[in-house]
Amino acid sequence: MSASNKGGYKTPRKENLMSIENLTNSEEESEDLNTAMVGNAVESQPKVTSRRSTRRPSPTKKYQAYQKESNGKGQEERIVVNYVEMSDERSSDAEDQEEEESIEESENAARPAAKDLHLIQSEYNVAGTSMFGFNTPKKRDAMALAALNATPCTPKTPKTPRLGVKTPDTKRKKSMDQPKTPAHVRTRVKKQIAKIVADSDEDFSGDESDFRPSDEESSSSSSSSDAGNSSDNDAADDEPKTPSRARRAIVVPVLPKTPSAARLRQSARAKKSNEFVPESDGYFHSHASSKILTSDHTLDRLKNPRLAADRVFSLLSEIKTSAEHEGSINAIMEEYRSYFPKWMCILNEGFNILLYGLGSKHQLLQSFHREVLHKQTVLVVNGFFPSLTIKDMLDSITSDILDAGISPANPHEAVDMIEEEFALIPETHLFLIVHNLDGAMLRNVKAQAILSRLARIPNIHLLASIDHINTPLLWDQGKLCSFNFSWWDCTTMLPYTNETAFENSLLVQNSGELALSSMRSVFSSLTTNSRGIYMLIVKYQLKNKGNATYQGMPFRDLYSSCREAFLVSSDLALRAQLTEFLDHKLVKSKRSVDGSEQLTIPIDGALLQQFLEEQEKK
């Protein structure tokens, strides 16, 4: 294949050259400017050497050929430049052909080609971008963009994706968006409401039968109702539907059925029957009468209603126990007696002895007193005695042992005086034996504080016993440190004969000593006006002691007596004082037949007379 055909250039024919010359001669005057431009173009062409050009053809496009194209009407021809996409991947044969073409083009470049002249002399101008497509297009602000890209920038922190919370629609918008409930659904709901109202009206009829349908009837009724509902649904589905565009599914809330009164009663009965649990005392509750009857079978109607205290104790002493039991008790007591030297050593070291355990410790402490302390100064205190007071105990120490006279009225001042007296005679020691440190008259805070202060004196040694299981609750940390006890378990299994001699008992005539002691302690804590009011009630009750129909002192009589004695100024003040008496059970109040309020003191007349005599002496 020749180089001319490959390169796309054709050798100009002779006829073409002649036509070009004639055209130039006839239009010489009008085309002077074009001829000058042709000369300049020819002169400006560089001389081509045999050296291969260092510039490589465009990698993407190359001139293929100049083709002539007419518009179909014989008018002027125009040059159309066709581009052929070139592949970057060429074979070795194609490279050899391109070398041959470049050599041939360099040989023919020295003379102008006919096509070049034709292009210059043509009436149409060819755009430079069509011919010189290898020029690099300029970009505006390219250097500024390059400098900006070369500048290091801090990378942007990726934004945290926001959870899109949709703004709730307004009520008006919702009403506009949501379509209306279909007509057949509204009709069905209306029928159901009317049916419920009719059922509720029937429940209030006169015949309220307790008829309960069986399982078969209920199942049949439910199946029939389901069938009715399905038929209604089928009828609704058979209605012709108007075609419309797709809508959202409409959820129609099903109205809950209102339970009728009869159904509620039936469910309540069923629930009550299911929750019934038989109780052991249910029979007595069902057969008991509302009125509570008090029996008159009292101890006074017995042949021997109540015995004297001496008689009771003599009868109890005649009871004989078995020899084995007595032998065991004696063995236990002998073991405890062997502890006496240890207890004496502990007392001399500054500690105090506390005995606890089941059984009376009175006999054991008395044995220690007789056998060990017969040569020492000893003060025995019976804590179970109902009339015992701390003042009596302090007076015994100051007057009988120290010969210091009557102790001060304040118990703490009396303890201070005792401590000062013992400091003057350090060789004198006092052994204080307290039976039942937790007795009824020693359980108050004041008595325990005085005893703890006495136990802290170096010259006084305390030996006590307790019987109540909760006795340690009486003492706080300070009292325990003052007592400085050494605890000993002395379970004797002996009866509490002496400890219970003064307790209230229905079998003993002299019961009430404890109540009398309680009344003394409460009475001593009252104010002057309260004591005067209480003494008026005591005197009135003793005055009517022999009256069999005595029911109590009327409230109006008490109020008038208090007004005359200037003890109260109003009815409310008197009732406030009586409230305190009622709380401490010093007075009982009851209503008589006529509705008046009667006040009585629940203590035997002999004890009440003894109390009055004691108060008059003071």
From Swiss-Prot:
Residues the record lists as Phosphoserine modifications: S26, S30, S87, S91, S92, S260
Q: Superkingdom of the source?
A: Eukaryota
Q: What is its main location?
A: nucleus
Where are the Phosphothreonine residues found in this chain?
Answer: T24, T151, T154, T157, T160, T167, T170, T181, T258
Q: Where is the composition biased (Basic residues)?
A: 49-59, 183-193
What keywords appear on the UniProt entry? Centromere, Chromosome, DNA replication, Nucleus, Phosphoprotein
Q: Where is the composition biased (Low complexity)?
A: 151-161, 219-233
Query: What GO CC annotations are associated with the protein?
Result: alpha-heterochromatin; heterochromatin; nuclear origin of replication recognition complex; nucleus
Region described as Disordered: spans on this chain? 1-116, 149-274
The GO terms this record gives for MF are:
chromatin binding; DNA replication origin binding
Known InterPro entries for this protein? Answer: ORC2, RecA-like_ORC2, WHD_ORC2
Q: Does the keyword Phosphoprotein apply?
A: yes
UniProt similarity note: Belongs to the ORC2 family.
What's the protein called, per UniProt? Origin recognition complex subunit 2
Species: Drosophila melanogaster
